């Protein structure tokens, strides 16, 4: 059975365009993969703690020396990574905030980026360990940045995902959402056209 993991990272629980479009894409992919199981990871609802001394300490303490608190932190990270590993298709709703990803998504990345677990260092450089998955990233942006030096959003996402082994990545952009009704309509129509073709 195909498993689709949808990761919502908007800072709004209702009405976020990245989430709405990610929902549409997941529904389309579910139709294309009969019997597919859908798992939704809502990062806003999860409220993962930002990377701090306690989280880093847990990740870098040998398993046989961890405290109960550290074991709980690592167990949460392990569960997030297992969820990612179990997915065949990953859909990420990733709005652009101030030229980057949401703090929720950055925190999620910090919780799943673990040396020896999701990547490793070799004599030839780093190697991602989460492989063989298709990733769709649905972005929502108030302005238009694609193809300009101000688009630090797309390369960051591609770089991080590639670092942990996720190299088959397709982007669906909805840009210009805050540039007036006509621009918003055109942006959503373009995104939905890409969703239909996915």
From Swiss-Prot:
Enzyme Commission code(s) on record: 1.6.5.-, 1.7.1.17
Pfam families named among the record's database cross-references: Flavodoxin_2
Sequence positions that bind FMN: 96-99
Cofactor binding note of this UniProt entry: Binds 1 FMN per subunit.
Required cofactor names: FMN
Keywords: Flavoprotein, FMN, NAD, Oxidoreductase
Enzyme class per UniProt: oxidoreductase
GO MF terms, alphabetically ordered: electron transfer activity; FMN binding; oxidoreductase activity, acting on NAD(P)H as acceptor; oxidoreductase activity, acting on NAD(P)H, quinone or similar compound as acceptor
Gene3D superfamilies xrefs: 3.40.50.360
Cross-referenced HAMAP family: Azoreductase_type1
Record function comment: Quinone reductase that provides resistance to thiol-specific stress caused by electrophilic quinones.
Family label: Belongs to the azoreductase type 1 family.
Protein name in UniProt: FMN-dependent NADH:quinone oxidoreductase
Protein's gene: azoR
């Amino acid at each position: 059975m195909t498993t689709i993991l949808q990761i919502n990272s908007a800072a709004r629980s209702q009405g976020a365009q990245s989430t709405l479009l990610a929902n549409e894409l997941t529904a389309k992919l579910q139709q294309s993969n009969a019997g597919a199981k859908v798992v939704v990871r809502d990062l806003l609802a999860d409220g993962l703690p930002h990377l701090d001394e306690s989280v880093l300490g847990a990740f870098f303490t040998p398993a046989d020396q961890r405290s109960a608190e550290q074991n709980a932190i690592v167990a949460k990270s392990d569960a997030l990574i297992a969820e990612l590993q179990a997915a065949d298709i990953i859909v990420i709703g990733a709005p652009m905030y101030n030229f980057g990803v949401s703090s929720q998504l950055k925190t999620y990345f910090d919780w799943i980026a673990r040396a020896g677990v999701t990547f490793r260092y070799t004599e030839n450089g780093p190697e991602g360990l989460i492989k063989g998955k298709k990733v769709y990233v649905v972005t929502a942006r108030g302005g238009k940045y694609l193809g300009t030096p101000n688009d630090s959003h797309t390369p960051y996402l591609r770089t991080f995902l590639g670092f942990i082994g996720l190299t088959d990545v397709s982007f669906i952009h909805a840009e210009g959402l805050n540039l007036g009704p006509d621009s918003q309509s055109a942006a959503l129509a373009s995104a939905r056209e890409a969703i239909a073709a996915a």
